[in-house]
UniProtKB/Swiss-Prot annotation:
Superkingdom in the source lineage: Eukaryota
Gene3D superfamilies: Trypsin-like serine proteases
Any Pfam family matching the protein: Trypsin
Protein name in UniProt: Thrombin-like enzyme AhV_TL-I
Chief location of this protein within or outside the cell: secreted
Residue ranges of domain Peptidase S1 in the record: 1-229
Additional record remark: Negative results: does not have effect on potassium channels and L-type calcium channels in vascular smooth muscle cells.
NAD among keywords: no
Disulfide bridge partners, by residue number: C7-C141, C28-C44, C76-C236, C120-C190, C152-C169, C180-C205
Source organism (scientific name): Gloydius halys
GO cellular-component term (any): secretory granule
């Protein structure tokens, strides 16, 4: 997270960290949506990874920290055919449920769609310098704004983004506040509702007029609820 500060230890009980089993490198975030399921970005998938819940400092563990591995992973269309503007979403079923504790609690899915102009909070253990690989020990948090989708389309002509998309655009037009490498998969929380999953942005991060894109959770609710209910062949929104 660029331009933020250390998150309050009590404000991110739903935030999970994905890290490689071998090198213990933290590579993505995610959001606990109930005792057994985590929502993150499809591009965060790896062969072997673990999920750390209830974590704040990487060096000093919380007493209620928990580790899980994926029992099942679900992708929209049950394939990995996500593109920059579509289907960058993955549902992970944990190998065993977690109980709520001091630093662990799920975040409910959104009850209404987000509105442009909302203030949104982003969080994660990703880079805190736009260009250097400086990673913090604790998660950083910052507020950004939900922008018109066109504001993510115009600055990136090379991506040939479609006119409409199940993607949210969020950032600060003057730059300086943004998600960055390592924050992918983490939540975008607008007006207190979980509305987006960090998907992609510019490199270097936080440049003026180069906001980032977030997968729109609201558009995928039916798919999410179906998968959790056991309808594993549920189709993704077209």
């Amino acid at each position: 997270i660029i331009g933020g500060d250390e998150c309050n230890i009590n404000e991110h009980r739903f935030l999970v960290a994905l890290y490689t089993s071998r090198s213990r490198t933290l590579f993505c975030g995610g959001t606990l949506i109930n005792q057994e399921w985590v929502l993150t970005a499809a591009h965060c998938d790896r062969k072997n990874f673990r999920i750390k819940l209830g974590m704040h400092s990487k060096k000093v563990p919380n007493e209620d920290e928990q580790t899980r591995v994926p029992k099942e992973k679900f992708f929209c269309l049950s394939s990995k055919n996500y593109t920059l503007w579509d289907k960058d979403i993955m549902l992970i079923r944990l190998d065993s449920p977690v109980k709520n504790s001091k630093h662990i609690a799920p975040f409910s899915l959104p009850s209404s769609p987000p509105s442009v102009g909302s203030v949104c909070r982003i969080m994660g253990w990703g880079r805190i310098s736009p260009t250097e690989g400086t990673y913090p020990d604790v998660p950083h948090c910052v507020n950004i704004n939900l922008l018109e989708y066109e504001m993510c389309r115009a600055p990136y002509p090379e991506f040939e983004l479609p006119a409409t998309s199940r993607t949210l655009c969020a950032g600060i037009l003057e730059g300086g506040k943004d998600t960055c490498k390592g924050d992918s998969g983490g939540p975008l929380i607008c007006n207190g509702q979980f509305q987006g999953i960090a998907s992609w942005g510019d490199d270097p991060c936080a440049q003026p007029h180069k906001p980032a894109a977030y997968t729109k959770v609201f558009d995928h609710l039916d798919w999410i609820e179906n998968i959790i209910a056991g309808n594993t062949d549920a189709s993704c929104p077209p």
